[in-house]
Amino acid sequence: MGVGMQDIKRRIKSVNSTKQITKAMELVSSAKLRKARLKLEKTRPYFKVVEETINDIVSSTQGIRHDLITPREVKKTAYIVITADRGLSGGYNANVIKAAVNHLQEKERVSIIAIGKKGRGFFRKRGYDLDGEFTKISENPSFSDAQGIGKLGMELYKQELVDELYLVYTEFVSTITHKPRVVKLLPLEPQTGGEGAEKPKERDEFMSYEPSPEEVLDYLIPKYIESMLYGALVESSTSQQGATRVAMESATDNATDMIDGLQLQYNRARQASITQEIAEIVSGAEALK
């Protein structure tokens, strides 16, 4: 067997080993995606109601001063950026980081609360201030994770170490479609929405808050922040699993195509080798005549 054929066989073996790995990862990510989607389907309606409720309340408390809804001069802005702890997810990490960078370029001073090793590594390498980092939670986030992140963000805001707080995450649309989003968390303000969105409800003059509007907001706003963060973590986790599944499926398909191409090269080389051997035998027989 010629050196060329041996090399092709080694390459086929190597690519086939890689294919087995990517296929296994595809199956694992498919199982994780199914689990994440079930979690998302259960949590999404609840957090949508929470968002609409707090929006209605804030809209009806115009004129009431509260630290978490009253804007102030912006000297520094913090961004909570949700990424994954690992790669192999196509453009998932790059897209959400790009959305964050595009938005923060408009700010004078910024700091980052990094969720996931990929985001932490990106912003640390480029010299951004890191107010906090959370790892090993991106694949299977819990509500307590959201509470810890929310507590840090609100403390920074209350202590006036930052004057705005944004959340950057990836919304899950479908297995192959994921949409980076940038949402302002603090100071809290009514969401006007885009075209077709419902108009904010008019203030109810007879609405009252016990014991006081400020104390009601003291309780509700932290719950809202935690809910938004948990919803974003679940959306991002589902998007990550979808991106990983698609990436591994594509890698497996590419490996299959490569093996087919190498097998064709091997068959042609083998055919050429056999033809050459036959020609040499015939030539030798002719020489003996």
From Swiss-Prot:
Coarse class of the protein's main subcellular location: membrane
Membrane topology of the entry: Peripheral membrane protein
Pfam families reported for this sequence: ATP-synt
TM ranges: none
The entry's keywords: ATP synthesis, Cell membrane, CF(1), Hydrogen ion transport, Ion transport, Membrane, Transport
Gene3D superfamilies: 3.40.1380.10, ATP synthase, gamma subunit, helix hairpin domain
Entry GO MF terms: ATP binding; proton-transporting ATP synthase activity, rotational mechanism
Any one Gene Ontology cellular component term annotated for this protein: proton-transporting ATP synthase complex
Entry's Gene Ontology BP terms: proton motive force-driven plasma membrane ATP synthesis
InterPro entries: ATP_synth_F1_ATPase_gsu, ATP_synth_F1_gsu, ATP_synth_F1_gsu_CS
Compartments it resides in: Cell membrane
Chain coiled-coil ranges: none
Record family assignment: Belongs to the ATPase gamma chain family.
Subunit structure: F-type ATPases have 2 components, CF(1) - the catalytic core - and CF(0) - the membrane proton channel. CF(1) has five subunits: alpha(3), beta(3), gamma(1), delta(1), epsilon(1). CF(0) has three main subunits: a, b and c.
Task of the protein: Produces ATP from ADP in the presence of a proton gradient across the membrane. The gamma chain is believed to be important in regulating ATPase activity and the flow of protons through the CF(0) complex.
The protein, known as: ATP synthase gamma chain
Species of the source: Alkaliphilus metalliredigens (strain QYMF)
